[in-house]
Structures are given as structure tokens and as C-alpha cells.
From Swiss-Prot:
Tissue: Expressed in endocrine cells of the larval midgut (at protein level). Also expressed in endocrine cells of the midgut of adult males and females (at protein level). In the midgut, expression occurs mainly in the anterior region (at protein level). In the larval central nervous system, expressed in about 40 neurons in the brain hemispheres and ventral nerve cord (at protein level). Highly expressed in larval and adult gut with low levels in larval and adult brain. Very little expression in the larval fat body.
Region (Disordered) residue spans: 42-78
Source organism superkingdom: Eukaryota
Induction behaviour: Repressed in larvae by starvation for 18 hours with levels recovering when larvae are refed with yeast or glucose.
Cellular compartments per GO CC: extracellular space
Protein's GO biological process: neuropeptide signaling pathway
Functional note: Ligand for the CCHamide-2 receptor CCHa2-R. In one study, shown to be an orexigenic peptide which induces appetite and stimulates food intake, leading to the release of insulin-like peptides which stimulate growth. In another study, shown to be a nutrient-sensitive peptide derived from peripheral tissues which controls growth by directly regulating the production and release of insulin-like peptides.
Keywords noted in UniProt: Amidation, Disulfide bond, Hormone, Neuropeptide, Secreted, Signal
Keyword Disulfide bond appears in the UniProt entry: yes
Cited InterPro entries: CCHa1/2
Name of the gene: CCHa2
Organism lineage: Eukaryota, Metazoa, Ecdysozoa, Arthropoda, Hexapoda
Modification type Histidine amide: residues: 39
Protein's name according to its UniProt entry: Neuropeptide CCHamide-2
Effect of disrupting the coding gene: Reduced food intake in adults and larvae, reduced locomotor activity, delayed development with mutants taking 200 hours to develop from egg to pupa compared to 130 hours for wild-type flies, reduced levels of the insulin-like peptides Ilp2 and Ilp3, and reduced wing size. Reduced levels of insulin-like peptide Ilp5 and reduced body weight of mid-third instar larvae.
Amino acid sequence: MKSTISLLLVVICTVVLAAQQSQAKKGCQAYGHVCYGGHGKRSLSPGSGSGTGVGGGMGEAASGGQEPDYVRPNGLLPMMAPNEQVPLEGDFNDYPARQVLYKIMKSWFNRPRRPASRLGELDYPLANSAELNGVN
């Protein structure tokens, strides 16, 4: 009985590992982006025909001199063109939205703190309330 259960577990584990390996071999092509090394490498030349084939006009320009937006087949996430490189991360000053947010946060944190104007009307007693109210 124990040998049958252990044999069944080994078979199940083998099937699961084989399924994972078959999914892993799809590589980057399953996600529609360029792989650098390994299997599933997309060719950088548009005429080779070994790409994933998102559209027939990958190298063609759209109307208005702009290249078309490259979208995954499911339409959820944009992907890069075959000859496009990852844009470099810009400097902090290149992001005006960050600058605006930084200025707002800085003004909030650098705002002078004023003491409560009505210390005598507080709902709770202070430890040194006599000193704060000027009573000796």
C-alpha cells in the first residue's frame, strides 16, 4: 500500500515538473517581448520572419510619421518594437509631476507649527497647565 502511494506521488510530481518545463520553454515569446539569451530569442531584423508576428507592418510607419503602438495580442500591456531599446531612466528633474509633488510635500513638511491658541479650553488637563496659562 505504501509503495503504491509513493509511486503515485512520484508519477504526479513527474507530470507536474514536465508541465512546468514545457511552459518554461515558451520563454519570452509567450509574453511577447525580446529575450536576450536562451530559447525564444526574437530576431532584430524585421524581414527575417522569426518574430512572434504581432502584425504585418511592424517596420512600417503609421500615418503622421509615427510608428504604430505595439500591443500584446491580448491588448493589455504594450510591448516594444523589435528594433526598439529600453528607454533610459531619466533624471529626477525630467519629471515635472515629481517636482510638483515634491514642492507640495516640502511645503507641508516645512510649514511652521503653531501651538494651540486656546490652551485654557482644552478638554483634557495638561501636566504643566499652570505654567502654560501663566498662573504661578
